[in-house]
Structures are given as C-alpha cells and as structure tokens.
Amino acid sequence: MKITLQNLGKRYNREWIFRHIEYEFIVGKKYAITGSNGSGKSTLLQVIAGSLMHNEGNVEISSQQWAVGSGQLANTTKNKHQTISNEQHYQYISIATPYLELIEEMTALEMLRFHSTFKQLILPAAEILQIVNLQASANKQIRYYSSGMKQRLKLALAFFSKTPILLLDEPTTNLDEDGIALYHQLIKNYTTNKLVIVCSNDKQEYSFCEEALEMGRYK
C-alpha cells in the first residue's frame, strides 16, 4: 500500500498554503511532516485523509498487498497496484488529531463500540481501555474527561483500528509524561506493517520516523 502525492496544492482564497508537492509514502515505513506553525502541516494531513479538498494535483492511495479488515498483509497478488477510489479512502485510514471531535454524551466504552461499527478493532474495547489506562473511567461520559484522557481515547481509536494507514497530528497534545510514554509504547507495539505519518514540529513526537517531508519547501 502507498500514498502518492502528485503536484499537490492547496489554497485558501488566493493564498497558496502549499504547492507542487511530489511525494510517496509506503506501507511499513514511518514519516514525519514537519514545519513551523502555519506552514500547512495539518492542512496537508487533512487533504491526505480526505477531509479537505485540494485545489490542484492528486492524492492517490493504491493497495498492493493489504487485505482491508484483516489487519495483516495478504499473500495474494490480485490486489497489487490497485488504485482505491476516493470514496473508499476512509476504510484504509485511521487518524488522531486535536481537532477530532469525540461524542461527549457517550462513555469511552460506547465510543469504541460505536467506532467499531465503521472500522474493526484489533482488540475488544475493554482491553483497549485497559491498555490506554482508561479502564477506571470506561463508563463515564466523555464530557467529564480531562483533556489528557480525551487524547488517550483519540489515540486508542486510531491505533486499534484495523487499517493500514495511521495519521497522527500533534499526537502528544495534552498528554503528561505517562501519556507520552504510552504514545511511544503504542508506536512500538501496534504499528508493525503500517504506514505511519506524524504531523509535528516537536521531535519527541516523530523521533522514530525514517523520513521527513519539510513543508517549508513547498510554499
């Protein structure tokens, strides 16, 4: 599986946020999108995720060996080089961002189970909450969670979905030291064979990444 950006550009009104991005992200590798505040990092991630439209160029997701919903690479060759339609992109992508809204009337347990109706989870909801240390608040409405607890839940929804692509925007926002340690443990234990893209200007959030796309090059 890979994501290919072809001459990609995004503007608001007449101002270009970025232009002429040519880049390829490949499954099994971890990438950082870096740059100063206002450089377009989050905008690019939203374009890749399909939640924002671009103004020029193309975002192509192609499946080579990933079987959707299986959580693993397939051995067959029939899916190689298959381009995925824009309408199906969401099936392959999980995302955690500061601007992602949770349904605050739900409990964490309800939120995970609701999420699983759209994307399979790799573990039972109760076990996931234990891993992210939210088991004691599993039946508490999310509206009563602290900002750090909400961020742990956002990470849980993203990391434990059966998708080959994981997008993370400022993933340690609102996390304390224990939360940051949890984030790195999740990266270590649950991203094997995934395509991971971390959007950040904080090196501790992407220190494990093998390549970086610097947004300052595409103004």
Specify the residue positions occupied by each region the protein language model found.
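Q-loop/switch helix immediately C-terminal to the Walker
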Residues: 99, 104-119
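Hydrophobic anchor residue at the start of the ABC signature
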Residues: 155
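Conserved ABC transporter NBD signature motif
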Residues: 57-66, 73-91
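Conserved structural motif at the start of ABC-family nucleotide-binding domains
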Residues: 3, 18-20
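Conserved ABC ATPase "signature" region
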Residues: 113, 123-137
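Helix-to-loop junction immediately C-terminal to a conserved catalytic motif
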Residues: 49
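ABC-family nucleotide-binding domains
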Residues: 37, 169, 176
